[in-house]
Amino acid sequence: MYNADVLAFGAHSDDVEIGMGGTIAKFVKQEKKVMICDLTEAELSSNGTVSLRKEEAAEAARILGADKRIQLTLPDRGLIMSDQAIRSIVTVIRICRPKAVFMPYKKDRHPDHGNAAALVEEAIFSAGIHKYKDEKSLPAHKVSKVYYYMINGFHQPDFVIDISDTIEAKKQSLNAYKSQFIPSKDSVSTPLTNGYIEIVEAREKLYGKEAGVEYAEGFFSKRMLMLDHDVLGGEQ
């Protein structure tokens, strides 16, 4: 078992990088232990293959500096509420034992992203129940902080994190997914192959401008936030 600072869940490999790649790189710079879990193998993606996607995901995790990347095999486009799915995610949570869990924001054009969040929320609750049995009979674990990152779209976040120093790492991690974002003569045209990385960069640029920095990623919090600094910007 691990004692992770952060465990970030995505429905598909590349979700986490899109939503919070810069923040992961920032956490790693701060010597935080960060782990990623992809719920599906993205086997229904229009481009690439499962084996290639795994290679790309491993490279993206290396670029960001994540300590570990876990691959579950829940069905792509089949992230429905089930005991088996929840139990699999509970096992991951109890293995990683994170302080904070990040997951996709529910308001998203892709149903898998919202469904992933619903499953992870259920698993977080069950992971803290001592009598709930996971796949490995691990001890219960209560997650302290729960946050949501954005994949598709632009929403007014609860807070943003400055990623001005790590935006390049984020872009490099996305470019590791050549099969998804870089069109080729054999690729199918999708929203991802039509300037998607540039769109994500523009979004983070806008969040940064609104917050007074160059780039920022936006998040939602399950609970009300207590700031570490006062409204005048000084340290408490």
Curated annotation (Swiss-Prot):
Keywords: Hydrolase, Metal-binding, Zinc. Its cofactor is Zn(2+). One of its GO terms (biological process) is bacillithiol biosynthetic process. It catalyses: (S)-malyl N-acetyl-alpha-D-glucosaminide + H2O = (S)-malyl alpha-D-glucosaminide + acetate. Disruption phenotype: Mutant shows a 2-fold reduction in bacillithiol levels. BshB1/bshB2 double mutant does not produce bacillithiol. The keyword Translocase does not apply. One of its GO terms (molecular function) is metal ion binding. Its EC number is 3.5.1.-. It holds the Pfam family PIG-L. Zn(2+) binds at H12, D15, H113. InterPro entries: Bacillithiol_biosynth_BshB1 (IPR023842), GlcNAc_PI_deacetylase-related (IPR003737), LmbE-like_dom_sf (IPR024078). It is an enzyme of class 3 (hydrolase). Belongs to the PIGL family. Involved in bacillithiol (BSH) biosynthesis. Catalyzes the second step of the pathway, the deacetylation of N-acetylglucosaminylmalate (GlcNAc-Mal) to glucosamine malate (GlcN-Mal). This is N-acetyl-alpha-D-glucosaminyl L-malate deacetylase 1. It comes from Bacillus subtilis (strain 168). The gene is bshB1.
